[in-house]
Amino acid sequence: EFGKNIHALASYYLRGENIDKMELSLSEHEAAVWNYLKGIKYFGYEVVNTEYNLSLKLGDAFFGGRLDALVKEDDTYYILDYKTGSAPKNAKFDYQTMIYLLAVSKFFKTDKVKFIYIDLKNKEELAVEYSPELGEEYQKRLVNAAAKINSDEIPPKKTECKCEYKAVCF
């Protein structure tokens, strides 16, 4: 619930909507996190979109997701991802990072893209910067992952899936 509230508040705020009543209803902890988030430099950049669905086709496979926010300063795009838990251990090669950076780079036809994990718990930021070389590596990894999923190489587990993608697990 906490994470959903912060995500919604950030989306409304970045779209320029009046959030006064929402801010008044925040708990002390939520207010502290919200004040940190709205004070980050990225919230002063040009807003491209919030809660932005994107997709990417590589070979026969489709990849997609929903960005928390996409902002821009000068000619650089910043993908913002608010984490109420922790950022991935290897953020550079996390599937979310790879898909989002590659999709935004291809859609906007630019190499000037950065993925910013915003760790709300520890009030830290972790940035991954896109490059053409990294994009090539991402494409290889994603195509290989899709091929493995579509082959018999990865048998479905018999245990209950608890990941955020459980709706599409086999």
What are these regions (language model features)?
Residues 1-170:
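RecB-family 4Fe-4S metal-dependent nuclease core
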